[in-house]
Amino acid sequence: MLVNIGFGNIVSLSRIIAVVNPGSSPMKRMKDEARKRGKLIDATEGRKTRSIIITDSDHIILSALQVETILQRINEINRVEDGDL
């Protein structure tokens, strides 16, 4: 299943390990390190980064959507998969 992370950008749900807030120092360091390694994907379309998605391939994806918004989308996908809708 795929999750829309904003502006038409999608990520495979099975590859997501975590969705975190970008404000803490460790997350800023993680973002900088990913940039140096060539593992940073900026999907913000020039807007403020509101969440960081960490994948199992060690990629860091920046999104302009709030963590809560992405979580709602993931939960909706899970409900559809479970047949609750």
Swiss-Prot record:
Signal peptide residues on this chain, from the entry's feature table: none
InterPro entries (UniProt xref): RemA-like
Coiled-coil intervals, chain numbering: none
Entry-linked Pfam families: RemA-like (PF04025)
Similarity field: Belongs to the RemA family.
Protein name listed in UniProt: Putative regulatory protein THEYE_A0405
Organism: Thermodesulfovibrio yellowstonii (strain ATCC 51303 / DSM 11347 / YP87)
